[in-house]
């Protein structure tokens, strides 16, 4: 099967799901087959338990909105607003002069270049984002976790698509105390990496459903006016 290679502007949305501000103790976790965890795992004996805690924290977050800063592989910096609602919905609205708007309605992810008036689509299920916008997030089952480093103030998880259909890897950086998602990094197979840092997040509030609808005709009319 042909591998899915996503544009970097779509790949940056791979892991949009935020953790709750305060994490609750996860229930006992007993995987059916115990995997073998080696370096770069700093606490290999407790990886299953730690992943279960991260899952529980992310599953406790059904929505958030706030700010993001993106650093592209070439060092270019973009800022903007993010809205996320599980399952399946996310919106990245870039500040000018970046013309991009990226929206998932739960089925399809659309990238709109507001200068060129172009719309590029990819099924949400074909992106790594699908794993982390699910109604029930389970990192151990849904991805191949290839690293979990517990550092002072941070837990750093690296995962990739276990099926081999998607290129690259994703690194998630969590606050070690609250397990709130702070940063994610998308690494591609060409040595490039895109970093997205989240800030000023408000969790589990109501979000206007229209944020996750992208209509081509209305956007074009708005641009011409």
Predicted feature locations:
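A short, Trp-centered hydrophobic/proline-enriched beta-strand micro-motif
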Residues: 56-73
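Gly/Pro-enriched, hydrophobic low-complexity segments
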Residues: 140-141, 150-225
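Flexible, surface-exposed loop/linker segments and immediately adjacent secondary-structure boundaries
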Residues: 116-155, 160-163
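Extracytoplasmic
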Residues: 59-63, 77-79, 85-87, 96-97, ...
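Short hydrophobic/aromatic-rich beta-strand segments that constitute the beta-sheet cores
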Residues: 66, 90-94, 109-112, 157, ...
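Sec-dependent N-terminal signal peptides
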Residues: 1-21
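Compositionally biased, proline/threonine/alanine/serine-rich low-complexity intrinsically disordered stretches
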Residues: 17-53, 216-225
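An acidic-aromatic
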Residues: 24-30, 81-130, 194-195, 200
């Amino acid at each position: 099967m042909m591998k899915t290679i996503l544009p970097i502007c779509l790949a940056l949305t791979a892991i949009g799901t935020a953790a709750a501000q305060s994490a609750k103790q996860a229930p006992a976790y007993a995987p059916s087959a115990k995997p073998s965890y080696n370096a770069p795992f700093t606490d290999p004996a407790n990886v299953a338990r730690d992943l279960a805690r991260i899952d529980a924290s992310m599953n406790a977050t059904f929505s958030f909105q706030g700010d993001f800063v993106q650093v592209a592989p070439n060092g270019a910096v973009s800022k903007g607003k993010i809205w996320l609602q599980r399952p399946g919905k996310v919106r990245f609205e870039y500040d000018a002069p970046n013309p991009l708007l990226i929206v998932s309605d739960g089925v399809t992810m659309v990238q709109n270049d507001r200068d060129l008036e172009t719309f590029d689509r990819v099924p949400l299920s074909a992106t790594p984002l699908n794993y982390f916008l699910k109604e029930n997030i389970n990192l151990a089952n849904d991805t191949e976790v290839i690293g979990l480093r517990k550092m002072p103030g941070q837990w750093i998880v690296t995962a990739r698509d276990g099926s081999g259909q998607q290129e690259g890897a994703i690194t998630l950086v969590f606050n070690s105390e609250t397990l709130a998602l702070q940063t994610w990094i998308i690494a591609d197979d060409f040595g490039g990496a895109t970093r997205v840092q989240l800030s000023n997040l408000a969790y589990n509030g109501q979000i206007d459903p229209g944020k996750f609808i992208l209509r081509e005709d209305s956007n074009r009319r708005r641009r011409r006016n």
